[in-house]
């Protein structure tokens, strides 16, 4: 699997099973993860553990995967930037289902491995709405 977008999509398929051990075969040993809320993490299993504390279960509905034309600096380093864009669906810890929760993930792929992963989604907003502190 040489295409950076294919690598990211397979990583996401595995991490959403969840199978962070298998997903790790697509990550560099020194991978840097910045999860929602600016939480630094070291490996895919950290993401799975965090998601287990926030959701009963969660999956991604990938709407598109975009490989971005590299900047001169990224190209010189052999990096490809990939964005995965879509929505989350699943159940909150109390069993209430949700869907349509937007996400954007940014990945850097080098030599067939993911070296950086940044994750954003609307879950915090949805939690505020459920608490009666915001309106969507």
Explain the meaning of each model-derived region.
Residues 116-136:
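Low-complexity, intrinsically disordered terminal/linker segments enriched in charged
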Residues 75-79, 107-114:
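Short, solvent-exposed coil/turn segments at beta-strand boundaries
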Residues 83-85, 104-106:
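Conserved hydrophobic/aromatic beta-strand scaffold that supports enzyme active sites
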Residues 1-26:
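Short acidic-aromatic low-complexity motifs
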Residues 30-32, 85-91:
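Generic short beta-strand segments
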Residues 62-64, 98-104:
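Short, surface-exposed coil-to-beta transition loops
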Residues 20-80:
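A solvent-exposed, acidic/Ser-Thr-rich amphipathic alpha-helical stretch
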Residues 59, 89-99:
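Short, cysteine-centered beta-strand-loop-beta hairpins and adjacent loop/turn segments enriched
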